[in-house]
Amino acid sequence: MSQPWQPTASIKQLKQRAAVLSSIRDFFAGKEVIEVDTPAMSQATVTDVHLHTFQTEFVGPGYAGGQTLYMMTSPEFHMKRLLSAGSGPIYQICKSFRNEESGRYHNPEFTMLEWYRPDFDHHDLMNEMDELLQLVLQCDKAERMSYQQAFIQELGVCPLEGTMEQLKGVARTLGLADIADPEQDRDTLLQLLFSMGVENKIGQQVPAFVYDFPASQAALAQINPTDNRVAERFEVYFKGIELANGFHELANGDEQLVRFEQDNMKRISMGLKPQPIDLHLIEALRAGFPDCAGVALGIDRLIMLALKLDHIDQVTAFPIDIA
């Protein structure tokens, strides 16, 4: 029986984890993508209503009253500042922090792989990510489907044109009436249906890329110029697990600022505290952000799947409950 001080991952599994990380670095070195290192804390943070941050106070010289700092939920904002400064293609493997659940697929502190490719759109980046997944997971080429196709295929309703009542009707067939019937926000309802009725059905044999999410869920992605109902965003699923979230990145600083402000208005309407907007990012976008695509991938989940394990604690030395 293991003792409380011991790692939850075996030494063998930690060595296998190290080998996967080494293969990822070799993959990017072969493509001349530069590894970078950015801060784990920032004076600003994400405004996304679905993300919850850790924060602390810096009380060093000049900050007698304390400076609030936020642990980064991803390295995205700092990496985009590097891109605007002319870095070219970059990647990072780092710790990220989200003040949310812990469990089979979640730990508040986790390892993220994030990379950006100037002159790529989201389809180009899906191609490259498919290469990486085949390397690490030893799987066949991924399948691809639009968000609309996935909804119609698995739930029989169009997420872009279906009425709220039609969406709630589908939720009732899934046994989700108690949650869905009082819901007034369309995106919340769509996310509920996707998580409960689509995610666990796609990508069972090979990874599945789902692209062109509703424009209302664009976040930091561009709107599709030929169909303004959808955003140039994708997610990746395998064995019912979300692995990654990628964008054809929004380059317009003014539009990004509006989206952040809209997020904060939504946070207030939901009884959540508005978050400080990263104005350094906004100015970096305004200064000249390259046309590019970027993606964030959960390393712990990826390695768990690569090793055919069923809990991220098996590939993490010290999860939150024994950290």
Curated annotation (Swiss-Prot):
Swiss-Prot/TrEMBL keywords: ATP-binding, Ligase, Nucleotide-binding
Pfam families, alphabetized: tRNA-synt_2
UniProt: substrate binding residues: S74, P75, E76, Y116, E249
GO MF entry, a single one: ATP binding
Binding residue positions for ATP: R98, N99, E100, N107, E242, L243, G298
Role summary: With EpmB is involved in the beta-lysylation step of the post-translational modification of translation elongation factor P (EF-P). Catalyzes the ATP-dependent activation of (R)-beta-lysine produced by EpmB, forming a lysyl-adenylate, from which the beta-lysyl moiety is then transferred to the epsilon-amino group of a conserved specific lysine residue in EF-P.
Protein name: Elongation factor P--(R)-beta-lysine ligase
